[in-house]
């Protein structure tokens, strides 16, 4: 398999794009060849990427009681997970959280809200918060508010939001096995609406929900077709009370191989390590940044805790990587 890895590297540096057939062959590599694939992915990142690691942060601005039945999610009203439920947080609390994350080294900040989407009335106080964040911080502003229409997304852009987060979560084939209350095409429609509104879209998914590596590859090609420039990679954190609470995690090397493949399929996109990396990768959690990743979600996640921002920044510096603005 060394030959196909090297041929792929040469083709990418010559300006070709990875095709689905070759990606499928690379997905079958095992053993020490995985390390070769990771090294090639690192070189591809260094050649096509921005040269610095981008750090984003979030606040769980509205939690629980979600109408959707995503099988991985603790916030779904369909499941029995023990999770805090509250409406939109006080604006001062959100702005305070943003200031803390900015001081600790984050470059981006996003409100994340539970629920299918937002009505125009529900969106109004959120817009006011973003206008405050634009005035009172230097953070790049992101939003993750579910399924919205283009008019709503344009209002977010006018309030200062430059990036909209809306995951595909899985491949088209596998998606119906994790969610039945909305469709894959509805997610794609929101992504296209955000792009039409002038925002960059951040979209990826979750590994280790029971999908195959071919499902992961198919999602990467879907993301490429959509022109996605920031790809968050989450790894399932099985939460008690959700349908996936007993789902076995894929091995760390399988995760690293998948990350490397994403870099080869999406050579110039941000590959952003997000939730679940601590538990799934264990002692190998620095290695995604050797396998092609160049961004990270830092601080706490939605319903689980991450490492401290300082720990992640130190890890990146120990790897010899540059961090934006630091």
UniProtKB/Swiss-Prot annotation:
Cofactors: [4Fe-4S] cluster; [2Fe-2S] cluster
Highest taxon of the lineage: Bacteria
Family in the record: Belongs to the radical SAM superfamily. Biotin synthase family.
Residues annotated as binding [4Fe-4S] cluster: 66, 70, 73
Amino-acid positions noted as binding [2Fe-2S] cluster in the UniProt annotation, renumbered to this chain: 110, 142, 202, 272
A Pfam cross-reference name: Radical_SAM
Entry's cofactor comment: Binds 1 [4Fe-4S] cluster. The cluster is coordinated with 3 cysteines and an exchangeable S-adenosyl-L-methionine.
NCBIfam families assigned: bioB
GO terms, biological process: biotin biosynthetic process
Keywords for this protein: 2Fe-2S, 4Fe-4S, Biotin biosynthesis, Iron, Iron-sulfur, Metal-binding, S-adenosyl-L-methionine, Transferase
Protein name: Biotin synthase
Domain Radical SAM core: 48-277
HAMAP family registered for this protein in UniProt: BioB
Enzyme Commission numbers on file: 2.8.1.6
Oligomer status and interactors: Homodimer.
GO terms for MF: 2 iron, 2 sulfur cluster binding; 4 iron, 4 sulfur cluster binding; biotin synthase activity; iron ion binding
Catalytic activity of the protein: (4R,5S)-dethiobiotin + (sulfur carrier)-SH + 2 reduced [2Fe-2S]-[ferredoxin] + 2 S-adenosyl-L-methionine = (sulfur carrier)-H + biotin + 2 5'-deoxyadenosine + 2 L-methionine + 2 oxidized [2Fe-2S]-[ferredoxin]
Pathway assigned in UniProt: Cofactor biosynthesis; biotin biosynthesis; biotin from 7,8-diaminononanoate: step 2/2
């Amino acid at each position: 398999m060394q030959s196909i890895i090297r041929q792929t590297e040469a083709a990418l540096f010559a300006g070709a794009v990875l095709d689905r057939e070759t990606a499928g062959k690379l997905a079958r590599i095992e053993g020490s060849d995985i390390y070769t694939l990771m090294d090639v992915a690192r070189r591809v990142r260094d050649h096509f990427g921005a040269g610095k690691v981008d750090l984003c942060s979030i606040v769980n601005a509205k939690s629980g009681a979600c109408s959707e039945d995503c099988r991985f999610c603790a916030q779904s009203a369909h499941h029995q997970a023990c999770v805090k439920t509250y409406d939109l947080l006080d604006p001062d609390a959100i702005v305070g959280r943003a200031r803390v994350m900015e001081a600790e080294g984050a470059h981006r900040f996003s409100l994340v809200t539970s629920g299918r989407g937002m009505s125009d009335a529900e969106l109004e106080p959120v817009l006011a918060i973003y206008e405050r964040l634009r005035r009172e911080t230097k953070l790049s502003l992101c939003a993750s508010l579910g399924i919205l229409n283009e008019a709503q997304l344009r209002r977010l852009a006018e309030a200062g939001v430059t990036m909209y987060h809306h995951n595909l979560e899985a491949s088209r084939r596998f998606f119906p096995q994790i969610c039945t209350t909305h469709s894959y095409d509805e997610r794609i429609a929101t992504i296209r609406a955000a792009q039409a509104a002038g925002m960059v879209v951040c979209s990826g998914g979750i590994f280790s929900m029971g999908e195959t590596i071919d499902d992961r590859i198919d999602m990467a090609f879907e993301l490429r077709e959509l022109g996605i420039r920031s790809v968050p990679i989450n790894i399932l954190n099985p939460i008690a009370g959700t349908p996936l609470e007993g789902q076995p995690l894929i091995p760390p090397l399988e995760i690293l191989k998948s990350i490397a493949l994403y870099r080869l399929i999406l050579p110039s996109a941000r590959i952003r390590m997000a939730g679940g990396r601590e538990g799934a990768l264990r002692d190998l959690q620095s290695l995604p940044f050797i396998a092609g990743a160049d961004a990270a979600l830092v601080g706490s996640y939605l319903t689980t805790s991450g490492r401290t921002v300082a720990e992640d920044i130190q890890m990146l510096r120990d790897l010899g990587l540059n961090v934006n603005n630091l």
